[in-house]
């Protein structure tokens, strides 16, 4: 299995959103299951010293698995039935440096893509920010002025961005950033 390391960054250009609070929302969402038709996924994140560590576990909803082997110099393919609640699992690991929110994601073919991880994290961060926005509007009272509501909505309009890190430097200089 060929594993690729992909660099990424998380940016927060909105001074009204506390990055640490959003990262804590990611950690608190670690018990959440992301269920789709063909898989269930969990994104587990922890906070240790200078880094956030993450594990993406994807459980495939399939009942067959292909095994291949060479027997007497001949290639054989065997289809194996999974039993009961057995599921195939894929794992991805990542880490994010707290000081600059730069990360490294370990990807292999057929596993959760980095863009899919970004989508899950974006959903969680947007939920957190919308709740923060709603709480601030609630503090205005029962009948807030539309101008005040619009100002609060504008305050939280800019959200976190997630992007691939592209860099022409060699791997040694990239790793020195961590």
Segments (PLM) and residue ranges:
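Terminal interaction module
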Residues: 1-72, 112-115, 119-178
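Long, hydrophobic/aromatic-enriched structural stretches that serve as scaffold segments
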Residues: 55-115
């Amino acid at each position: 299995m060929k594993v690729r390391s992909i660099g990424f960054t998380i940016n927060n250009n909105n001074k009204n959103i506390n990055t640490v609070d959003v990262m804590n929302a990611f950690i608190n969402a670690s018990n959440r299951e992301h269920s789709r038709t063909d898989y269930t996924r969990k994104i587990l994140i922890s906070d240790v010293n200078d880094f956030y560590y993450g594990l993406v576990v994807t459980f495939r909803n399939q009942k067959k698995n292909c095994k291949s082997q060479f027997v007497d110099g001949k290639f054989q393919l065997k289809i194996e039935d999974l039993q009961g609640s057995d599921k195939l699992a894929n794992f991805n690991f990542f880490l994010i440096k707290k000081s600059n929110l730069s990360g490294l994601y370990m990807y292999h073919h057929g596993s959760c893509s980095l863009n899919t991880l970004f989508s899950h994290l974006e959903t969680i961060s947007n939920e957190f920010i919308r709740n923060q926005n709603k709480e601030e509007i609630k503090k205005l009272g029962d009948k807030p002025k539309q101008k005040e509501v619009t100002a609060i909505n504008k305050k939280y309009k800019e959200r976190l961005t997630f992007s691939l890190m592209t860099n022409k430097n060699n791997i040694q200089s990239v790793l020195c950033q961590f």
